[in-house]
């Protein structure tokens, strides 16, 4: 299965901000952005060239792709579905990305990062409404109950991720029973509840050209 093999810290440095791709490390002073906030590569410290208009739009798309860990083909399919739905395409896009099972599992603290949560999903560690689902791109619907299997819940990694997520607090659009390793996807998140640094408007402009 295709996946992005670029080093995660390098991806954050490319965007110039934390994308929280490496779990707990991102919350410590060991984070690469804390130590080297400039772009990666031989000329990273000297990179001050202005991006072209296309470059700005492309960078906005790449940032969203990196945050949610989706490949170009997946992203285009998600955008097409967002455009097909009623409402604002940009908000629909982010909502669909947040409704992916790997993203919901991450928000519920079943993994320290989206990539770790994706691994839990693929390894048959997640139940949706009592049924095993191992497809990371599965779209969770409002009202769906997502939980760890008994085996996954017993793992030290999942326990640590749940405890860390609980200490930071859960988003408003989900509710989580940490003791049971179970959560409910209450509603699609509102745009105001999602990162302001994501510029989905530029993605719409990019794909409309």
UniProtKB/Swiss-Prot annotation:
Alphabetical list of InterPro entries matching this protein: Ribosomal_uS4 (IPR022801), Ribosomal_uS4_bac-type (IPR005709), Ribosomal_uS4_N (IPR001912), S4_RNA-bd (IPR002942), S4_RNA-bd_sf (IPR036986)
A Pfam family reported for this protein in Swiss-Prot or TrEMBL: S4
Matching PROSITE patterns: S4
Chain ranges of the S4 RNA-binding domain: 99-160
GO cellular component, one term: small ribosomal subunit
Keyword RNA-binding: yes
Keyword flag RNA-binding: yes
Gene Ontology BP terms: ribosomal small subunit biogenesis; translation
Gene Ontology MF terms: rRNA binding; structural constituent of ribosome
Keywords: Ribonucleoprotein, Ribosomal protein, RNA-binding, rRNA-binding
Protein's job: One of the primary rRNA binding proteins, it binds directly to 16S rRNA where it nucleates assembly of the body of the 30S subunit. With S5 and S12 plays an important role in translational accuracy.
HAMAP family: Ribosomal_uS4_B
Family: Belongs to the universal ribosomal protein uS4 family.
Description of how the protein assembles with itself and partners: Part of the 30S ribosomal subunit. Contacts protein S5. The interaction surface between S4 and S5 is involved in control of translational fidelity.
Record protein name field: Small ribosomal subunit protein uS4
Organism per entry: Dechloromonas aromatica (strain RCB)
């Amino acid at each position: 299965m295709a996946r992005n093999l670029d080093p995660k810290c390098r991806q954050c440095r490319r965007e110039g901000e934390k994308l929280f791709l490496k779990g707990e490390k991102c919350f410590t002073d060991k984070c690469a952005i804390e130590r080297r906030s400039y772009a990666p590569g031989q000329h990273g410290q000297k990179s001050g060239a202005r991006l072209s208009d296309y470059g700005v739009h492309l960078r906005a798309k790449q940032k969203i792709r990196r945050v949610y860990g989706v490949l170009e083909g997946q992203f285009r399919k998600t955008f097409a579905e967002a455009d097909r739905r009623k409402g604002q395409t940009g908000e629909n896009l982010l909502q669909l990305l947040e409704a992916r099972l790997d993203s919901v599992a991450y928000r519920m603290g079943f993994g320290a990062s989206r990539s770790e949560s994706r691994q839990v999903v693929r390894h048959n560690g997640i139940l949706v409404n009592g049924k095993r689902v191992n497809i990371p791109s599965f779209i969770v619907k409002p009202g769906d109950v997502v939980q760890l299997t008994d085996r996954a819940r017993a793992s030290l990694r999942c326990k640590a991720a749940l405890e860390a997520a609980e200490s930071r607090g859960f988003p408003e659009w989900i509710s989580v029973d940490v003791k049971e390793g179970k959560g409910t996807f209450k509603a699609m998140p509102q745009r105001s509840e999602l990162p302001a640094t994501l510029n989905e408007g530029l993605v719409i402009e990019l794909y409309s050209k």
